[in-house]
């Protein structure tokens, strides 16, 4: 139940422009946003693959399934493999107690705002190279309490991240550090700010999703108390 809840909290923290629920399956379409925002969440044991494929075909988009072991039907991954879906993007879902993050982060907290500032978005865009106007739209759809944290060096925003609180959990998203500021504690400062905000909102646990190949992120989160609760991946057909 925890894994399903966390993946759904994460989906609500990165809300697609269009979502249809079919039983426990979330069919999502969000042109202009990061590809994973449109991934299907197949969160019950029914076979709704054809329905999901039709949903995506009607909207002219590729089909992507987020495969979380223990949440999806046990044979879904193999069935998608048999239908020609490629496996990609090995991911790690990690959790920590908020108090542990605050203990381990060893950094002065950065600043927090309730909405993304232009400076926050500029720093985010320069690292991710994604479309700012699409991201503004996505962030405006988030319904749960949110925090936007940033760290500055000489008056310039050099690292950003955001958190969304739901049901006692704060999810961490959008962590980005400018290349010249990496390895200097800026990301830790952002994480400290988000953890402080989470604690003040009585979100006593934190979670995040990260690509397993991201060794820099792995080191940061390993050292700040986040431990893996599951691996998951995507099945993709374009």
Where are these regions (language model features)?
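N-terminal charged segments
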Residues: 1-58, 72-73, 132-133
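Short amphipathic alpha-helix that is part of the acyltransferase structural core
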Residues: 1-7, 39-43, 91-93, 98-140, ...
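Acyl-donor-binding surface of acyltransferase catalytic domains
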Residues: 45-119, 235-236
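Conserved acetyl-CoA-binding loop-helix of GNAT-fold acetyltransferases
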Residues: 47-53, 174-179, 183-196, 200, ...
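Conserved GNAT acetyl-CoA-binding A-motif
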Residues: 59-69, 198-209
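Conserved beta-strand-loop-alpha-helix junction that forms the acyl-donor binding cleft
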Residues: 66-74, 179, 208-218, 235-238
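Conserved catalytic-core motifs of GNAT/GCN5-like acyltransferases
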Residues: 86-97, 207-209, 218, 222, ...
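A conserved beta-strand-loop-helix scaffold within acyl/acetyltransferase catalytic domains
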Residues: 132, 136-178
């Amino acid at each position: 139940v925890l894994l399903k809840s966390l993946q759904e909290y994460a989906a609500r923290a990165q809300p697609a422009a269009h979502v249809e629920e079919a039983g426990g399956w979330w069919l999502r379409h969000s042109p202009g946003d990061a590809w994973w925002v449109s991934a299907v969440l197949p969160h019950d044991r029914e076979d709704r693959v054809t329905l999901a494929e039709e949903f995506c075909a009607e909207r002219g988009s590729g089909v992507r399934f987020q495969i979380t072991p223990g949440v999806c039907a046990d044979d879904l991954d193999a069935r998608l493999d048999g239908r020609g879906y490629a496996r990609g993007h090995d991911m790690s879902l990690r959790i920590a107690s908020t108090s542990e993050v605050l203990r381990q982060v060893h950094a002065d907290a950065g600043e927090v705002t309730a909405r993304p500032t232009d400076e926050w978005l500029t720093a985010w865009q320069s690292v991710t190279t994604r479309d700012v106007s699409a991201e503004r739209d996505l962030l405006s759809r988030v319904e749960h309490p949110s925090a936007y944290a940033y760290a500055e060096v000489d008056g310039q925003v050099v690292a950003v991240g955001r958190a969304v609180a739901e049901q006692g959990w704060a999810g961490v998203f959008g962590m980005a550090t400018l290349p010249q500021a990496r390895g200097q504690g800026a990301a830790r400062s952002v994480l400290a700010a988000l953890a402080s905000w989470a604690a003040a909102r009585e979100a006593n646990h934190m979670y995040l999703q990260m690509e397993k190949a991201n060794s820099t992120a792995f080191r940061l989160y390993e050292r700040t108390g986040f431990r893996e609760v599951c691996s998951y991946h995507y099945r993709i057909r374009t």
